[in-house]
Amino acid sequence: LFPYTTLFRSINHARLRYLDDITGSRVTTVMSNAANLAEEVTNADLVIGSVLIPGALAPKLVSEDLIRQMRPGSAFVDIAIDQGGCGETSRPTTHHDPTYLVHDVVHYCVSNMPGAVPRTSTYALTNVTLGYGLTIAQKGIDAAIEADPAVKKGINTYRGKLTYKAVAEAFGMEHSEI
């Protein structure tokens, strides 16, 4: 049997169109809504929850009722566990004891999943962050912020103030613009 993969369309439609183009008919994208989520989750052998709202807790999109409706022996992997998890039945586990059962569905909710492959994850993180660090080193922080909107967007604190709104809201702290 060939695997059937579904991705849910979120705010970034351009990115999902790109994925449609490069994967052809191997991946289906659908609009993210409760009905489509229920249809796909309850018919899946493997559900991978990957939800990120930068600086905030992940929304609980996979309810316990959906987990209950999954086939016995199916699996739920919650990649969002470091942000609180996107499943109501999710709880952090470790690489040493990675799985548990809820309603006969295997759950894998390991915190810091990249920690299982430290060399590879360090290499990947370095590849995506080195350019920003070099820009800051070459131009200084103020000029880097002005020159590169991505640098500005990635700053959480600046001159002693919390500048990332979602983090400030999550901790009930005051937010300041750069």
Language-model segments: residues:
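Short alpha-helix immediately C-terminal to the canonical SAM-binding loop
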Residues: 16
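Short, small-residue-biased leader/transition segments that mark boundaries at the very start
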Residues: 1-7
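Conserved acidic E/D residue at the C-terminus of a beta-strand in Rossmann-like folds
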Residues: 8-11, 31
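Adenosine-phosphate binding glycine-rich loop
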Residues: 81, 86-178
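Rossmann-like adenosine-cofactor binding region
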Residues: 21-103
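Residue-level "edge-of-site" marker
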Residues: 11-12, 54, 113
